Amino acid sequence: MRISSELRALRADPAAQRQLQDNVQAAKRSWLGQERVALMFRDLEQFAKGAELQACPALEHVFTAPGIAASVTEGLLAELLPAMRANNFAHPPFPYQYSDGLAIMELAAVGNVRLSLMMLEGDALHERGEARSISFADCERHEVIVAGKASARIVRRTGPDNGPARLDFEPVELVPGAILSIDGPYSTRLVDHVPSRLVTLRLTRVPVLPEPSREYRLSDGVLVHQSSGDRDESRAELAMALLGKMGRKDAAPVLARMALSGSDNFRWQAIRECLALDAAEGFRVLTHVSRDMEDTLAAPAGALRAQLLESYPQLETVECPA
């Protein structure tokens, strides 16, 4: 592997590495010190504490007044881009990620509130092909188009949460200055076409106890996936699924304990994964849940227990908790 002489020299000089990063951090501090940005970040603190957006004027103006979001973003780029060019081995001073044509830079994270600058590449969106499903997350979301354009749809759903949904579509053209506000788990937006790139400034706030995120098939509204709306539970669900794929039977007792607390959706997933890894351990916790009449999962747990006993009578011999 070829390593440039500049990079080789930098690897041998930790002080120079720190200086590069300090230079970029100085650009970040300069942007944060701008009056409009400082007021916006002050309001972010109040927004994260539960204040309505209308009660946070500096923040509200960014997502309602024409040109403010572009001005804030241009101010950031005016500080950050020269610093990154002059210190091209430094990392951006904000958390960032890039995957499948979607780049996200997190400008602020305060409690359950996130302020992010996002960029979607049209070529990558085209390569994915036509969307077959749409996800609805329980969060308040405000977006301003900073640059680029796109054809999109606002998607609204009605019907039962755990069954087929009726999906209604409203076409929208996203152009610089366009503003979208989406609140709650019953509406979202779907980008269909981006000629080049779409740059968006996004503000999100997740409730303290969010509803599960739900994914529906676009063609008929069938529910195809449901996951916890809580970040910690969502990460735990991914870990449970990974343990299941790995066949980690030794994790079954841990999953059994996880099945006793948390949201109903999370607990049900823990029961299923526990059953798949260790039928006896899973059946014990399933029985425990089914016998607790105060438990909101008692009825579905009892129904599943009856089905399993019908198919696998030998489970009747499993010693279950009192």
Predicted regions and their residues:
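Alpha-helix N-cap/helix-start positions at coil->helix boundaries
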Residues: 232-233, 249, 263-268, 295-296
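A short, N-terminal "cap"/entry segment at the start of jelly-roll beta-barrel domains
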Residues: 9-115, 218
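Conserved short histidine dyad/triad with adjacent acidic residue
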Residues: 117-137, 173-175, 182-185
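Structural detector for internal amphipathic alpha-helices that build alpha-solenoid repeat scaffolds
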Residues: 236-245, 268-277, 299-310
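Amphipathic alpha-helical scaffolding segments comprising HEAT/armadillo-like alpha-solenoid repeats
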Residues: 218-224, 248-259, 279-290, 313-320
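A short hydrophobic beta-strand segment most commonly corresponding to one strand
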Residues: 141-142, 179, 193-213
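Short acidic-glycine-tyrosine-enriched beta hairpin
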Residues: 142, 157-189
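Short, conserved beta-strand element in jelly-roll/cupin
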Residues: 137-152, 156
